[in-house]
Regions:
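… and, occasionally, acidic/histidine-rich disordered N-termini of signaling adaptors
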Residues: 171-215
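Regulatory loop-to-helix N-cap segments in sensory/regulatory domains
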Residues: 125-153
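Signal-transmission linkers at sensory-effector interfaces
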Residues: 1-37
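Amphipathic alpha-helical coiled-coil segments that mediate homodimerization
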Residues: 27-35, 40-56, 63, 183-186, ...
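A short, aliphatic-rich beta-strand micro-motif
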Residues: 105, 110-120, 126
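GAF sensory/regulatory domain recognition
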Residues: 49-53, 60-90
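Signal-transmission/dimerization alpha-helices at domain junctions
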Residues: 1-11, 136, 148-172
């Protein structure tokens, strides 16, 4: 083989590396473009699934995210119902970095090859389990060397989900505040400032948001 200039790599290896980098870059661009265009999360997850399944040839995956209350499985394929059997808090929360599962005392985890945590501000916000990696896939390309790339892609998606949820919460709060403000104005228009008050009659007016009283 002719050696690539300065790299010491044969041209075939160099071409392969360039192709891999091009694939990674285009995948990142596709995901970030979808997020910036405010594409629904389910559609973004479909793009992610296509990249992992069709382009990287990985046939088993589970993605859990934390919605502040509990762990949710937001994507799974090839998992044969295992996504419902794994207790994330008990079985995964100690994992802080990309971990190869060679053999685990937890039976459900033995069905997978790699656990990829998504850490944000030192806290795990998601876990990705990948399995059914072929031997050659596992050792060479696109096996373990692609795991940091998969972690980056998943991280971008999960942080986007967090941001969307946070934005929705803020929007809901703003709508509620506006409703209270408007109700206050309506109250001033509908009721006199001084309502009658004596021993026989005591009238007061106040507004309660339907969101706060469960109406």
């Amino acid at each position: 083989h002719y050696m690539g200039l300065k790299t010491g790599l044969p041209t075939s290896k160099l071409t392969q590396k360039l192709e891999q980098n091009e694939f990674k870059l285009s995948s990142l661009l596709e995901i970030t473009k979808a997020i910036n265009n405010n594409v629904p999360i389910q559609t973004i997850l479909k793009i992610f699934e296509y990249i992992i399944r069709e382009q990287l040839g990985i046939s088993k995956l589970i993605l859990y995210t934390n919605n502040q209350v509990k762990w949710d499985c937001i994507l799974h394929f090839g998992s044969r119902g295992l996504n419902k059997k794994i207790n994330v808090d008990k079985e995964l929360s100690h994992i802080q970095e990309i971990t190869v599962i060679e053999s685990s005392s937890i039976e459900t985890l033995n069905s997978f090859d790699v656990v990829i945590p998504i850490i944000h501000k030192k806290n795990p916000i998601a876990y990705l389990l990948i399995g059914d990696l072929e031997e050659e896939l596992f050792n060479i390309s696109p096996g373990l060397k692609h795991m940091p790339f998969i972690q980056t892609l998943a991280s971008i998606i999960v942080v986007a989900i967090e941001n969307k949820r946070f934005s929705n919460e803020i929007l809901e709060q703003e709508i509620n505040n506006k409703e209270m403000e408007l109700a206050g104005e309506m109250q001033k228009l509908l009721f006199p400032v001084d309502l009658p008050s004596n021993q026989q009659l005591d009238v007061a007016a106040r507004y309660e948001s339907k969101h706060l009283v469960g109406g």
